[in-house]
Amino acid sequence: YTGSTILKGGTLLFKDVENASKAFGSLGKKVVMSGGTLQFSYKKDDKQTHSFPIEVAEGTSSTIKCPSHGTLKSVISGNGDLTLVIPYLRYYVNSSFADFDGQLTVNGVPSEGSNVLFMNESQFNSPKLRVNLTGKTWMGAWTTHANNVVGGISGEKGSYLVGSSKNTKGFKCSWTVGGANSDETFHGIINDWATIGKSKTGTTSITKVGTGLWRLTGANTY
């Protein structure tokens, strides 16, 4: 079919992920998230990439249940709120948020007490994007040295804003935060860890911009 897919409630589950993604993406068909949940089946070592356009309808809250080790390359637009539910171990986001004015919530759902990585394949450049970290989510960049720009960052206790690099000691990672001019509170911890964890450390730097208030309540160690 040639029109958009509008999801207003319930869950739309794709078991044949490859064909479903092609149906949305190959012809530029758009998925309009307007209150429902989009879910993708996952098999071990199944590295999925989703690139179909996504519009998040104004005044709605919608959810995407992401597959582990997947990559989101969609153009995201709209004014609603979108939640990404990420299972152990990680999920990559390499999307354009230039036309998105809502809030992106990232909910890490760990297994056996572990944390979940939410990261860009290279570095973040989303000066309007407001990100809220929930669950046990780490936010970082996969490339070794990264200059990240994010509109705003909030988060629960137990979340982390880390540095960059998968497994390189001595990385340099900067976070420029505040371009959305919104008031945000981050209860998590900002540290010098690489995305692999405390076994590899580098230098994480913070630059606050914009007119909003950014409250940091955690025991930050960067």
Set out the residue ranges of the language-model regions:
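N-terminal extracellular ligand-recognition/capping segment immediately after the signal peptide
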Residues: Y1, V17, S26-L38, Y42-I54, ...
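Extracellular repeat-rich scaffold modules on cell surfaces
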Residues: Y1-L27, E58-R130, K157-Y222
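Acidic Ser/Thr/Pro-rich low-complexity disordered segments
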Residues: E18-S21, K44-D45, Y91-V93, T144-A146, ...
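Trimeric beta-solenoid/beta-helix "fiber body" segments of extracellular/virion adhesins
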Residues: G35, Y42, S68, I86, ...
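Hydrophobic residues embedded in beta-strands of well-ordered beta-sheets
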Residues: L38, S61-S62, T137
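Self-maturation zones of extracellular/virion spikes and adhesins
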Residues: L38-Q48, I54-E58, W142, A146, ...
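Hydrophobic residues on conserved beta-strands that form the core of alpha/beta folds
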Residues: S51, L72-K73, V150
